[in-house]
């Protein structure tokens, strides 16, 4: 049986394919999800993004778990999970990725988050899955890895205006604009948006690249199609094809942040590095192209975690170190922690 909720609250299965249910999840996250330490910015996952993030192959609707207030019928809590094969230290384990745990700000004293976690765990166990991977900004005992975010400025003036970046005596506005200028020429001239016909080759290219890491998703072709096929304002994926073969891959997703108190701007448009594979050029050149493509798509900043081989390009490409770190956790699986460069998985 489901876990008991405090008096006046009920469990609710959110149907993200239903416009109204999805809007409720969107509103809950928009007003109550992750903020930076100074409470200036808050993640603003779009409705289309949530549909993409929550409907991967083999997802179970029952794992989109909401809590509603009985009297108002308002959604005040949410958690989600989806199944996938995770390779950890060379062993493939059926796991779930858990995400979007959120409780309304006014109810944080009610201890609803632990109940949401217990309930999603119970429902996952019913499907005979006993392990999970998740990330959090907070420290819990004990992360398998702890990755810092890095930021590549694109729209200098806006990022400074909203307090995301700052100038100093040595870095004036005009110097900053010059410093972060992005060349409009791509290194890989033939980069194009990924198409359906590329799925098989991208599947092979990416899985082959990921196999060197300590933890990664063992993607199926269906998962590759779901996670990488381009969707405007959600996921951007580019491939470099040579003689009919896909040799290089760039992908980044769109996750704006709501600016909580600024007259001039209400949103920072951030591109987040997803999965990138370089075989015909250096990773530096590939990531330089990713930044250029993010600029072409009107993003203000390009963010990347120090996972996979990313860290090797940050200095050359003028990424600045962020404040936040993202901690990776495994549930019910013991293993030694490892360096972020051995992490081959990106959670949204």
Q: Where in the sequence are the language-model features?
A:
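Active-site/acyl-donor-binding loops of N-acyltransferases
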Residues: 2, 130-183, 236, 242, ...
